[in-house]
Amino acid sequence: MSSIIRKVISTSKAPAAIGAYSQAVLVDRTIYVSGQIGMDPSSGQLVPGGVAEEAKQALKNLGEILKAAGCDFTNVVKTTVLLADINDFGTVNEIYKTYFQGNLPARAAYQVAALPKGSRIEIEAIAVQGPFTTAGL
């Protein structure tokens, strides 16, 4: 049996992990990206402006990690969106769909009691290194 590749993915263009975890892990061709909040990687602080600005920054951070793994948003097959207030879903969805277009990933969204650093949003993702072929059912 051949061994499976496992590699930690890291970039200084996204916030460093604030706990005992990696920004992302590549296993074979699948990338598991840890939850990203709206933290500015240079300051280590949440961006000001509320959930909309935090969502943009979280997605920017996600994009930088994907790029470090040789991917982009088109490689994402599943996301999980955690919200401090589910009433922010509409606002977040408008921003989300500017990053994900065409063949959209599967997604789950939940309201949670609290998020790291008082964030209003956290987004995690699973991506697969391409290339892809779109098939009909």
Curated annotation (Swiss-Prot):
Pfam families for this protein: Ribonuc_L-PSP
Enzyme Commission number(s) from the entry: 3.5.99.10
Residue positions, PTM Phosphothreonine: T74
The entry's keywords: Acetylation, Cytoplasm, Hydrolase, Lipid metabolism, Mitochondrion, Nucleus, Peroxisome, Phosphoprotein, RNA-binding
Predominant place of localization: cytoplasm
Residue numbers carrying N6-succinyllysine: K13, K60, K67
GO MF annotation terms: 2-iminobutanoate deaminase activity; 2-iminopropanoate deaminase activity; cation binding; deaminase activity; identical protein binding; long-chain fatty acid binding; mRNA binding; RNA endonuclease activity, producing 3'-phosphomonoesters
Record-linked PROSITE patterns: UPF0076 (PS01094)
Tissue: Liver and kidney.
Gene3D superfamilies linked to this entry: RutC-like
Location(s) in or outside the cell: Cytoplasm; Nucleus; Peroxisome; Mitochondrion
Gene Ontology terms describing biological process: G1 to G0 transition; kidney development; lipid metabolic process; lung development; mRNA catabolic process; mRNA destabilization; negative regulation of epithelial cell proliferation; negative regulation of translation
Catalysis performed (reactions): 2-iminobutanoate + H2O = 2-oxobutanoate + NH4(+); 2-iminopropanoate + H2O = pyruvate + NH4(+)
Signal peptide residue numbers: none
Function: Catalyzes the hydrolytic deamination of enamine/imine intermediates that form during the course of normal metabolism. May facilitate the release of ammonia from these potentially toxic reactive metabolites, reducing their impact on cellular components. It may act on enamine/imine intermediates formed by several types of pyridoxal-5'-phosphate-dependent dehydratases including L-threonine dehydratase.
Family membership: Belongs to the RutC family.
PANTHER family: 2-IMINOBUTANOATE/2-IMINOPROPANOATE DEAMINASE RIDA, 2-IMINOBUTANOATE_2-IMINOPROPANOATE DEAMINASE
Subunit structure: Homotrimer. Interacts with YTHDF2.
Protein name per the record: 2-iminobutanoate/2-iminopropanoate deaminase
Underlying gene: Rida
